[in-house]
Amino acid sequence: MKKNRFLTRMTALLLVLVCMLGLLPTAALAADAPSSIKLEDCTHNGVHYESPSLGTCWLHQMTFDYNQKSTIGFCAEHGKGMGWSLEGQTWGNPKPITDPTVQTMMAYYYAHTTGVFTDQAHALGVDEVWGSDYSWTMNAWVQAIIWRYKAGLLADPATACAEELLCVYNNLEHTSYSSIDDLLDGMSFRDRTQYILDLGKQGVWGECTVYEYQYTGSSTSSHQAKDVQAIMIGNLD
């Protein structure tokens, strides 16, 4: 009888342990990604450029409350709505994004706009914090890369990213480069992009955990809920 009670208790303890272990992935996800994020600020500067792959791209910056920290987010669906009338609205149902190009470019952006650099970045001297104007330009570049990822247009990451860098640079700096192999200050657009991606593979920009959030807010005077962009946002480790 005592032996049966002992076995019953051991079985119960094992079941509890299994249940606790089963909860760990969910708990880890919850720790990395809040269940919802809120738009704090959406700013459009009225500037746009043309991308052969994406069409017209308008420059904008969006700041979200992400784990009680103001964090830049990016639109995930080119052509859908986003604007100041959505400030205070929420996005939820986070889904992890594991594409290495997206993770690298978002880590690159966050590192240079927040000043959070790895020891490797400091050692290599790639630890310059961008000013406001340059941050807008780089925001447009990373935004275009995310849109291309969602459109399935990142088969050759270095080429795709270089093409968008060329478009952004030409339109915002009023230049007329025609090929990603053209030299800018002695280095081609292709080589610049490849260098950034290679450093990302080495962990120089840090590790960026990226999630995509779906709109869960209500319709506003300017945007119907069904037409609002999903958001990609990350946390730099």
Q: Which residues are covered by each model-predicted region?
A:
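Short, surface-exposed polybasic-aromatic patches that bind anionic ligands, especially phosphate groups
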Residues: A31-T216, S222-Q224
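C-terminal segment of classical bacterial N-terminal signal peptides
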Residues: M20-A28
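C-terminal functional modules
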Residues: G206, G217, A230, G234-N235
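Bacterial N-terminal signal peptides that target proteins for export
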Residues: K2-L14
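A detector of low-complexity, intrinsically disordered, Ser/Thr/Gly/Pro/Ala-rich segments
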Residues: F6-R9, L24, E207, Q214
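N-terminal compositionally biased, intrinsically disordered segments and leader/signal-like regions
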Residues: R9-A12, A27, S221
